[in-house]
Amino acid sequence: MKDYKLTIEDGVITWVENADENGNPISGRLFIPKEVTAFDMDAWVFLGCEAEEIVVDPENDVFSSAHNCLLSKDGKKLIKVCKNSDVSKITSLEIIGQDAFNDLNAQRDEFLFKIPEGVKILDYRAFAINALNVEIIVPSSVRAIGALAFMIHSDNAHIVFEGDAELEVGVFGTELEAKDSDIEVYNSMPSILYPKKEKLTVTCPKDSKVYRYCKKYGINVSCKTTN
């Protein structure tokens, strides 16, 4: 299994040796040493989510890893998945972080995912998915969903809401810092961003906030009553 050498400056990963800045994802094992405290967005560390393993040095004070997932130190926030991540086994999870799932650079046949019960927050752009078939099940424990949380590119997408989650417009998430020039643009962005709305279906409780949200913002979806 291939390892990747990280370039680290003042605790920030600024580059990954052998990662492909032209759009080809890295593969193999990604080891995060103890001195890493942040990731530069231009480092191409997680492009395509194709790493097979994510391992964090136990002495790292900021990050941790479990079941091939990159997590906050306390294990409550999912920061990034890789090809072999098993999120369902992480019982401490409360937040799906920004860009935790990002497949926009390479289309997959399908993306089927049930968010673990106990998760409370879906951050800004938590799911940036490019797949022919998509199904995401949102449990009743989820109470807040940030803007652009579902950035889905698919010909057949289905989002199932089991509870009464609050979908937001213009909410940047728990950590995102936007430039002043971006605020007006992002304030117009809904939680569900989907370029082919006629191919999207939503299942949710009839009297839920999700149902009212879809009606209020004119999202072209079909809301059905769950049993």
State where each predicted segment sits.
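Structural signature of tandem-repeat unit edges
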Residues: 1-14, 21-40, 47-69, 73-95, ...
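A structural signal for leucine-rich repeat
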Residues: 172-176
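Short glycine-/small-residue-rich flexible loop motifs, especially phosphate/cofactor-binding loops
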Residues: 98, 124, 211
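Short, structured coil segments at secondary-structure junctions
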Residues: 217-218
